[in-house]
Amino acid sequence: MSDLPGIVVTGASGRMGQMLMKTVLASGRARLVGAVERPGSDWVGRDAGAAMGGAAIGVTVTDDPLAAFAQAQAVIDFTAPEATVQFAELAAQARAVHVIGTTGLEPAHLERLAWAAHHAVIVRAGNMSLGVNLLTRLTQKVAEALDEDWDIEVVEAHHRMKVDAPSGTALMLGEAAARGRGVDLAQARVSGRDGITGPRAPGSIGFSAIRGGDIVGEHDVIFAAAGERITLRHVATDRAIFARGALKAALWGQDRRPGQYDMMDVLGL
């Protein structure tokens, strides 16, 4: 067992953090060697297994990420932008693969990730599931095949606690559509219409976000023309798909050179 890659999970007390830890523990392909929480969390100092309501697993939750990363081969991180860029710098110091599922990253955050990627492997994706990444590739292909007579809209739905919109996955799909069209998403993007908006701008890519209940994640890419419509759809019903994808990325990154990668690289798409 000791020759299996050691994994640290950040944001251990959150829903994704707990799912990630359970996935690593059940995988048989990696070891959970660390769990990180913010200072002041009531999880700090507790056994991670016991904190999740199960048996002790011999991993104590810590608020010292560098010490945890130093004993790991990979860090899996679904937290918040400011925390993620700090973790990226520390993971680079430890030369640990950093798998990032955090969304809502701004250009300034991405600049710091680019620096960290000079020293360590970073795998970052708005969505870690196989199905969504296949949807992304299909979206680009369909956008390549259809002209501007086909309007493109991305509609996403998530649980009421999600704090950013559009979702990272929706933006990933929008980027794929923009690549297919050969345009810059920043110029084509229209988010959340309200009031008197006037006619739809030709070539624009629209985004709409729904928040409610416990929706895990739903994404539709709509290609609409006069008299016909194509809808590409992915529905997530279990967060385990993201955890399994993140673990796959952490294992894949073990043999790679420092740099930035995404799930398309991991899946060979």
From Swiss-Prot:
Alphabetical keyword list: Amino-acid biosynthesis, Cytoplasm, Diaminopimelate biosynthesis, Lysine biosynthesis, NAD, NADP, Oxidoreductase
A GO molecular function held by the record: NAD binding
Disulfide bond positions: none
E.C. designation(s): 1.17.1.8
InterPro entries from the UniProt entry: DapB_C (IPR022663), DapB_N (IPR000846), DapB_N_CS (IPR022664), DHDPR_bac (IPR023940), NAD(P)-bd_dom_sf (IPR036291)
Locations listed in the record: Cytoplasm
Residues at which (S)-2,3,4,5-tetrahydrodipicolinate binds: H159, G168, T169
Catalytic activity line of the entry: (S)-2,3,4,5-tetrahydrodipicolinate + NAD(+) + H2O = (2S,4S)-4-hydroxy-2,3,4,5-tetrahydrodipicolinate + NADH + H(+); (S)-2,3,4,5-tetrahydrodipicolinate + NADP(+) + H2O = (2S,4S)-4-hydroxy-2,3,4,5-tetrahydrodipicolinate + NADPH + H(+)
Binding site for NADP(+): R38
Membrane-spanning ranges: none
Binding site for NAD(+): G11, A12, S13, G14, R15, M16, E37, G101, T102, T103, A125, G126, N127, M128
Record carries keyword Phosphoprotein: no
GO annotation, biological process: diaminopimelate biosynthetic process; lysine biosynthetic process via diaminopimelate
Active site location: H158 (proton donor/acceptor), K162 (proton donor)
GO CC field: cytosol
Pfam families per record: DapB_C (PF05173), DapB_N (PF01113)
Pathway terms, separated by semicolons: Amino-acid biosynthesis; L-lysine biosynthesis via DAP pathway; (S)-tetrahydrodipicolinate from L-aspartate: step 4/4
Presence of keyword Transport: no
Family from the record: Belongs to the DapB family.
Name of the protein described by the UniProt record: 4-hydroxy-tetrahydrodipicolinate reductase
